[in-house]
Curated annotation (Swiss-Prot):
Subunit (UniProt): Component of the CSN complex, composed of COPS1/GPS1, COPS2, COPS3, COPS4, COPS5, COPS6, COPS7 (COPS7A or COPS7B), COPS8 and COPS9. In the complex, it interacts directly with COPS3, COPS5 and COPS6.
Name of the protein in its database record: COP9 signalosome complex subunit 9
Organism classification: Eukaryota, Metazoa, Chordata, Craniata, Vertebrata
Residues annotated with Phosphothreonine modification: 26
Domains: entry comment: The Phe/Asp-rich domain at the C-terminus is necessary for its incorporation into the CSN complex.
Main subcellular location: nucleus
Length: 57
């Protein structure tokens, strides 16, 4: 027996929207743009060698 949606998410569906309700992918993209989050002003991109595998042994 598979759990029902209300058992998996007791607080409700939240901000997630069915693609049909959002008016297709265009509506979904508009929703994403409207809910865009800003990065904190004190956040610095200080990730030196994130993709550098030369130091991996």
């Amino acid at each position: 027996m598979k759990p029902a949606v209300d058992e998996m998410f007791p607080e409700g569906a939240g901000p997630y929207v069915d693609l049909d309700e959002a008016g297709g992918s265009t509506g979904l993209l508009m929703d994403l743009a409207a809910n865009e989050k800003a990065v904190h002003a004190d956040f610095f991109n200080d990730f030196e060698d994130l993709f550098d595998d030369d130091d991996v042994q």
